[in-house]
Amino acid sequence: GGALLALRAKSRGVSGELTNGCLRDADEIAELGFPVYCAGTFPVKSARDIETIGVNVPVMLGGVQIIPGDLILMDRTGAVAIPADRIDEVLKEAERINAREAKMEELIRQGMSIVDARKVK
């Protein structure tokens, strides 16, 4: 889709888009503050006939099944779907990893090699 579709989605309360398709108007969409993770960009407009085939239904994206209630986290480098029943577990592990990487970053800034920083518990 393009900027108009993103604007419409945002105005309807959609917090972002994750698609295995392409998009156009990437700069305009970024200016909207509407995050999109997609397969790529394509400058040609989309077909005029857009049909909703489901809302709050399971979908497959990139070989991963996403079920309503799953937590989707994405940035410019990728996206991850966390099953609803594992959100707490995964977020605790992410906090542990972030704390470890923050410690490693400090050690590297102090001159330690990455190899040695990885060995520190």
Where are these regions (language model features)?
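Channel- or pocket-lining gating/hinge segments that regulate access to a cavity or pore
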Residues: 78-80
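C-terminal binding/interaction regions
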Residues: 72
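Feature captures the catalytic cores and cofactor-binding loops of soluble hydro-lyases/lyases
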Residues: 1-68, 82-115, 119-121
